[in-house]
Amino acid sequence: MKQTILVTGGTGFIGSHTTVELQEAGYNVVIADNLSNSKIEVLDGIEKITGIRPAFEKVNLEDKEATERVFQKYPNIEGIIHFAASKAVGESVEKPLMYYRNNVVSLINLLEMMPKYNVKGFIFSSSCTVYGQPKPENLPVTEDAPHQKATSPYGNTKEINEQIIYDYIHSGAPIKSIVLRYFNPIGAHPTAHIGELPNGVPNNLIPYVTQTAMGIRKQLTIFGNDYNTEDGTCIRDYIYVVDLAKAHVAAMARVLDKETDKIEYFNIGTGSGNSTLEIVTTFEKATGVKVNWKFGPRREGDIEKIWGDCTKANTVLGWKADTPLEDVLASAWKWQQKLREDGVM
């Protein structure tokens, strides 16, 4: 019998790609999402790719009773992958209580349901933000690198939630967890049926690049060209969202295995960094489309450079991000063209 996995935030960017990979790996998927940052039409895209429409429940996970109804309706859930969260750094500074309520309360509600409904495995969507700006000698960062004080309430919710999961498991809760610390997910499914759907002006680099290339935005501003990097722009570890989704399938198989540790942590990235300027020039090379860009002043709170040591995920999960950057950026452009064709943007 197929194992059933609850994917919270499953109509979002990473959640939708992970749902596809889970279905293709033979799992049943139930999506719980309040659609605050995504669209119900994403389910159509998932179905076009896999031939299966996942079960869907519109629910606010900060509402404990509504959350419990999902578990009552689907009593065979064996594992949870928890993506659902508010995620805009700037907005979190303006509305910290909303972020703490949404991101922390929803986690607590899910964890409380697990023993009651015999759910064994929990994959948490964390972030490399917990590392802050690593010292140069600590690059690439490993899972045991020191954590820095978060620079935003959003980043702080990731740190707090990691601690809540740790404390709950160490209190003797009959569950297991894998915490995945992502770097920067980019790109879109090769079919262009699903991808990143920013609301309004994008917060992330790649949608801004593709929208500028399409003429939706007049100009891309690269924030800061005086950093201590080769070309003066920030460096990040950009990981293809499909590769990232496959890491969740590997993590779920592991967390449902009775023989593994109660809690484990994995960096999920490529293991190398690319500068902002490199991303723009590689996009132009991959697509043959010019991007109108300029340098601007540094943006407050931006980390200079970070990339992950992903050896542990490579060896323990048997997973590796190996899609070439040009292919990833071409997939993002194909998705942007599809959005234009469909009249979305």
Where in the sequence are the language-model features?
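N-terminal Rossmann/SDR dinucleotide-binding element
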Residues: K2-G79, V201
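Rossmann-fold NAD(P)-dependent oxidoreductase module
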Residues: H17, E21, M113, I164, ...
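Residues at the starts of beta-strands that form the adenosine-phosphate
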Residues: N28, K120-G121, K176
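C-terminal substrate-binding subdomain of Rossmann-fold SDR/epimerase-dehydratase oxidoreductases
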Residues: V59, I206-M345
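Conserved mid-core alpha-helix of short-chain dehydrogenase/reductase
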Residues: A66, N109-M113, D243-K246
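N-terminal Rossmann-like NAD(P) cofactor-binding module of classical short-chain dehydrogenase/reductase
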Residues: E78-I81, I123
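Conserved NAD(P)H cofactor-binding loop of Rossmann-fold oxidoreductase domains
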Residues: A84-K87, S126-S127
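Catalytic helix-loop patch of NAD(P)-dependent Rossmann-fold dehydrogenases
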Residues: E94-L97, R101, V105-E112, K116, ...
